[in-house]
Amino acid sequence: MSEAIIAKKAELVDVVAGKMKAAASIVVVDARGLTVEQDTVLRRELRGSEVEYKVIKNSILRRAAEKAGLEDLASVFVGPSAVAFSNEDVIAPAKILNDFSKNAEALEIKGGAIEGAVASKEEILALATLPNREGLLSMLLSVLQAPVRNVALAVKAVAESKEDAA
């Protein structure tokens, strides 16, 4: 192999390792058997949630995982592999890929990493069942508003009872 090709591959390993280090979550899938139309729809959905989706050779993924400190992730790089990286939303790639796999049986989640820790297929699927960031924030807001609303209702009830008494 020429030195130019080796240098390009080494650069690609560095780029992928950088993406792995920076990613909040990584999901590895086997996308073999997806039609072009399904793949296009999947990529569009992922792009809409700011998730980067790439098909990369396993040898490059293994080396990048080792360089990123995710040595245990190398075991899922068997057979055709596509990788989804998300720097912001931890749940988005798992949720989108899991939802998509329900309609496209050819898509199979293999495993991944969550905030720098290797995750099994089961852990990724469990992550996919959680609500996304906006859903979690709305739940938090509801929990925070409930006591304030209850106090407001109690004050209103006291005021109404005093008006009735007067």
Curated annotation (Swiss-Prot):
Gene Ontology biological-process annotations: translation
SUPFAM superfamilies for the chain: Ribosomal protein L10-like (SSF160369)
InterPro entries per record: Ribosomal_uL10, Ribosomal_uL10-like_sf, Ribosomal_uL10_bac, Ribosomal_uL10_bac_type, Ribosomal_uL10_CS_bac
GO molecular function: large ribosomal subunit rRNA binding; structural constituent of ribosome
Function: Forms part of the ribosomal stalk, playing a central role in the interaction of the ribosome with GTP-bound translation factors.
NCBIfam families, per database record: PRK00099.1-1
Protein's name according to its UniProt entry: Large ribosomal subunit protein uL10
Name of encoding gene: rplJ
